[in-house]
Amino acid sequence: MTPSLALALVVTAAPLCAQTPATPGARPGGRTASVNTAPRIDAETMARPIDMHDSVWIEHLTMLEVRDLIKAGSTTALILTGGIEENGPYLTTGKHNNVLKATGESIARGLGKTLVAPVVTLEPGNPLRPNLSPGTVVLTQATFKAVLTDMSNSLKTQGFKDIVMIGDSGGNLTPMKEAAEALNMAWAGAGARVHFIPEYYNYADVEAFEERELGIHEKMEGLHDDYYISAIIATVDTDAIRMPERVKAGRFVINGVPLAPIERTIANGRRMVEFRTQVTVEAIKKSMAKQ
């Protein structure tokens, strides 16, 4: 059984009691269900009845908005991968996913004519490893690559020409590269291409930028946490770095660097998002120019 099929079976399987055929048009409690039996309007061909919503995130757009954006030239899509893992006592397990909320938005707008697919929130790993930390949820390498493959094919089928893969967690990079290479072989001559962009994963450069441009020097405490990570996350969600609780406990500091005042930390986070955006957009444009 292929990973894609196995995943589909897990997602769609229903309890036996739920699979018992019901009376057509009937709902529990005797109400008639007309929504699933009445003819459905072919919305794909209808004119969009409201103004376009301003978002780069596909899941925040209607189908007609996505359709019209593609027709207007937004044929680049970002596939972003994060993870759910141990990040110390202050950062939530979704650290990488929260970073991508900030960087994904910025990269899409900086590149232009670009939409963002739903974030792949789980990273590859061994789900049977006995010492998984509390809260960690991982996919096998095969399943992770199957998800990337299915997402890419879904985007290509509806008209996206350039699929850009970006990973915020180091363990994501190799399987992303492999998935991109396999897809490009399968799509040869089809007018679409996958771009794997390792330049995005540049935390060493971010740390150097932090020291050079912001004058911040961290003294590492041994936690899976850094000032630059906390600052970037703070631009989208201060609860994800546990600001209220840490302020109350007198622990609103990381690696010797105060996170208060929060306005300064957010401003620094925005500068680091801008830095990562510039590097990533340049790398994407360079990859696209090779076609």
Where do the model's predicted regions map?
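Extended, histidine- and acidic-residue-enriched regions that form the cofactor-binding/catalytic faces
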Residues: 19-164, 168-291
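Bacterial N-terminal signal peptides
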Residues: 3-15
